[in-house]
């Protein structure tokens, strides 16, 4: 697929219920599917319901933005806002890193964008489409998400797991056509995991597993890929390799890739744009733009650390 779509947030508010219940839990029990259908429903056809991993979504043929307009994460019993009035843009062909301290709402924001949590005030647009009006199968062709949890498919081979990315296109029985198999092989090659295609998933390291899940998203052929802390639990070389891989995929395949991370310096060096969540607000810009505006210094907030705005490097004093 050659379509390109951007993400735009307009006046977005995310949060939790006042009683500490995560809104995704409330949403799963809700009968109001028009306010956000949990994409795990789509995964039931591909034996992935336990994973919480989205199937990719194939977007419409246009270059218009995905706009997320005036979203509020609310619960009938009330909600506590984590971050409000968020405005930001992620473009095709760019790697955007979402950074922020623990508890600022990074994962909540990603889950809201992916419609794993309900939206009540406002809408999410992909191109001209409000995602609340889309069927799960339509949504599963527009956006994919890789979460931190490891899928419990230990007896599958890598190729079989990647092939699940074709579920939105194969119908109920999940039979792969010759074209589906070609797309799966290409996705495996693009991520550089051809040598492990026949390995069992249970033998993979964390870094290898992340690459497999990225290949699965590529096989799903979505314009947008979301990743929640993909570099967590990886060693330093593994973090660099994975970030450079995502950067290359964004640039070469014109994907809109948005990921959350705590690895500030790696994000500064590899991201095209940053979304910085701080004090309930979202700051959007290139690494140099946010550095020049003083947001990176404020985010670090330590006298024992020196941040160089020109080189975007961090030094412990």
How would you name each of these model-derived features?
Residues 122-130, 139:
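Conserved ABC transporter NBD signature motif
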Residues 261-262:
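H-loop/switch region of ABC-family ATPase nucleotide-binding domains
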Residues 225-228:
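Catalytic Walker B motif of ABC-type/P-loop ATPase nucleotide-binding domains
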Residues 300-317:
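ABC ATPase nucleotide-binding domains
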Residues 114:
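Helix-to-loop junction immediately C-terminal to a conserved catalytic motif
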Residues 200-204:
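Conserved ABC ATPase signature
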Residues 99-101:
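The feature captures the beta-strand-to-loop junction immediately N-terminal to the Walker
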